[in-house]
């Protein structure tokens, strides 16, 4: 698949993203693979690219405003079928058991993980995401 990969932190005008060919990602247990139809760019993406948000994963495929169709299912996925339309959340994972998760404010979870920041996002032909965050 083709993907835009951020390999270094730099100002956007220094072109820190590179178009590369990568192997198609395979969904693991509880994950779906999305064939990306569109991925928006917002200020958060620019903060990630330019290093305004510290301690994220490199290299990374940015992009968290993802829409597309389910392309493949990992084991134990029950809520989606191939061809389903999906949107992918910025929030990608939480602990599920802290006070914030239990009261429905998962975005405050101290163990939260984010699409295009901790894990690869949607600036690619394919993206793998947890079923519960699509």
Feature map (PLM): residue ranges:
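Glycine-rich beta-strand-centered segment in the early N-terminal region that forms part
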Residues: 23-39, 50-99
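Short structural boundary motif marking the start of a folded domain
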Residues: 1-4
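Short N-terminal binding/cap micro-motifs at the start of the first secondary-structure element
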Residues: 10-16, 43-44
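Short gly/ser/thr-rich secondary-structure transition/capping motifs
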Residues: 13-19, 51-52
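Short beta-strand-to-turn element immediately C-terminal to the catalytic PLP-Schiff-base lysine
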Residues: 6, 49, 71-73, 101-103, ...
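NAD(P)H dinucleotide-binding glycine-rich loop of Rossmann-like/cofactor-binding domains
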Residues: 94-134
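Cytochrome P450 core scaffold surrounding the K-helix E-X-X-R motif
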Residues: 44-50
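Cys/His-rich metal-chelating microdomains
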Residues: 39, 45, 89, 101-104, ...
């Amino acid at each position: 698949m083709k993907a835009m990969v951020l390999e270094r932190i730099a100002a956007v005008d220094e072109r820190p993203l590179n178009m590369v060919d990568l192997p198609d990602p395979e969904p693991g247990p509880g994950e779906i693979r999305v064939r990306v139809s569109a991925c928006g760019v917002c200020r958060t993406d620019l903060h990630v690219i330019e290093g305004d948000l510290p301690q994220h994963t490199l290299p990374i495929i940015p992009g968290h405003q993802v829409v597309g169709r389910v392309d493949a299912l990992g084991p134990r996925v029950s809520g989606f079928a191939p061809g389903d339309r999906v949107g992918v959340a910025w929030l990608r994972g939480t602990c599920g058991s802290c006070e914030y998760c239990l009261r429905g404010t998962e975005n405050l979870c101290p163990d939260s993980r984010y699409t295009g920041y901790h894990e690869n996002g949607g600036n690619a032909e394919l993206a793998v995401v947890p079923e519960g965050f699509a």
